């Protein structure tokens, strides 16, 4: 889909971080080209945290869902390898901070392009559970299983496998697709600094 606006929930324990949080929100909005239109502040939080929800539009019959994987689908892991571990949390693979804003926005549009032309059957963005954890979530909601070849997962050579599999990237996705579409998906995403590879196949052994 196309993101239109964001809202946030900001919880603050240490007053001195207010300005940095607001500056970061502003930078993020400019980077992604999506305005922050509202939010809620909890000024006496137990921790410093920021949560964001995004509102957007998408064609209802072209949504990428996490429950559409089918037996025989190929599994694709797609990640922007041009990044670095965040200085405050090494499992956060930062692919956006130093990137040109147009490329960051184009990466989102690229996935939208694939969805609207039915190249992707199911998918999820890689989130806190990491690469394999995100795949497991997709398989669970699809009531399926999978065989995965770890060595085929796109990886930055400077990061250990232990950290890489647990990391969540700024731009990273798990897709399932028909075999005949995989090569196009890989080549198309390469133009947007996203390395994609077939890493396995969906089966019925959930």
Locations of regions flagged by a protein language model:
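Glycine-rich anion-binding loops of enzyme active sites
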Residues: 2-88, 201
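Secondary-structure boundary elements
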Residues: 27-32, 69-70, 112-119, 184
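Polyanion-binding loop/helix "lid" in catalytic or ligand-binding cores
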Residues: 98-135
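Glycine/charged-rich beta-loop-alpha catalytic/anionic-binding loops adjacent to active sites
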Residues: 58, 93-96, 116-117
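Glycine-/charge-enriched secondary-structure boundary and capping motifs
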Residues: 17-35, 43-50, 127-206
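Short, surface-exposed connector motifs at secondary-structure boundaries
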Residues: 3, 114-121, 167-170
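Short, structured loop/turn "capping" segments at alpha-beta junctions
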Residues: 88, 118-122, 145-148
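Short, compositionally biased
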Residues: 85-103
């Amino acid at each position: 889909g196309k993101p239109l606006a964001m809202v946030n929930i900001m919880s603050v324990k240490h007053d001195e971080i207010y300005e940095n949080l607001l500056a970061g929100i502003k930078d993020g909005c400019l980077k992604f080209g999506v305005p922050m239109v509202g939010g809620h502040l909890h000024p006496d939080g137990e921790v410093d945290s920021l949560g964001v929800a995004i509102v957007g539009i998408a064609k209802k019959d072209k949504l990428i869902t996490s429950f559409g994987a089918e037996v025989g689908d190929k599994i694709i892991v797609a990640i922007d390898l041009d990044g670095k571990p965040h200085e405050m949390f090494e499992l956060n693979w930062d692919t956006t901070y130093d990137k040109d804003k147009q490329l960051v926005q184009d990466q989102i549009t690229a996935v939208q392009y694939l969805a609207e032309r039915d190249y992707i059957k199911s998918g999820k963005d890689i989130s806190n559970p990491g690469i394999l954890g995100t795949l497991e979530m997709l398989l669970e909601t699809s009531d399926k299983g999978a065989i995965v070849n770890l060595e085929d997962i796109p990886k930055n050579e400077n990061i250990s496998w232990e950290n890489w599999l647990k990391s969540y990237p700024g731009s990273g996705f798990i897709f399932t697709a028909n075999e005949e579409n995989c090569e196009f998906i890989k080549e198309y995403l390469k133009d947007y600094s996203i390395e994609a590879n077939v890493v396995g196949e969906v089966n019925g052994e959930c």
